């Protein structure tokens, strides 16, 4: 009887630690970021984003909470070719989708500031970068 009580007391912190790790283990993956509606918006040169675009932007704003999630989101958004960058009303689908951005700076500035959080590294021409 004493052994089972001791075993239970030893297992409770272990299970609690496992639950905390499992809760923190979910990070955004590139597959979770659906940029298709944004690309279609840019190609059609529409003034209003589609419902799919708005829901994707709102979902993305809700999912990117940790620094790692925000960095993954920035990397994904940076991977979109520059030639599809919208102009005019399409330039800010988050605003049109009523999603509040977490920063007031332009996206390019916000992305540059997250790049600075990386550790310095040596570039191909042997200069210290970072």
UniProtKB/Swiss-Prot annotation:
Shoot meristem. The keyword Signal applies. Residues 80-130 are annotated as: Disordered. Residues 84-110 have a biased composition (Low complexity). It comes from the Eukaryota. Keywords: Signal. Residues 1-25 form the signal peptide. Residues 113-130 have a biased composition (Basic and acidic residues). GO terms for molecular function: lipid binding. Induction: By low temperature and drought. It holds the Pfam family Tryp_alpha_amyl. InterPro entries: Bifun_inhib/LTP/seed_sf, Bifunc_inhib/LTP/seed_store, Plant_nsLTP. One of its GO terms (biological process) is lipid transport. Gene3D superfamilies: Plant lipid-transfer and hydrophobic proteins. Belongs to the plant LTP family. Possible dehydrative stress responsive protein. Not shown to have lipid transfer activity. This is Protein BLT4. It comes from Hordeum vulgare.
């Amino acid at each position: 009887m004493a052994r089972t009580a001791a075993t239970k007391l030893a297992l409770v912190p272990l299970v609690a630690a496992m639950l905390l790790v499992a809760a923190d283990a979910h990070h955004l993956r590139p597959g979770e970021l659906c940029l298709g509606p944004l690309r279609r918006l840019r190609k059609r040169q529409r003034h209003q984003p589609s419902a799919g675009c708005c829901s994707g932007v709102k979902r993305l704003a809700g999912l990117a909470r940790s620094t790692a999630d925000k960095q993954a989101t920035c990397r994904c958004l940076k991977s979109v070719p520059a030639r599809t960058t919208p102009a005019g009303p399409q330039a800010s689908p988050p605003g049109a989708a009523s999603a509040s951005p977490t920063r007031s700076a332009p996206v390019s500035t916000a992305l540059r500031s997250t790049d600075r959080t990386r550790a310095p590294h040596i570039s191909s021409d042997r200069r210290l970068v970072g």
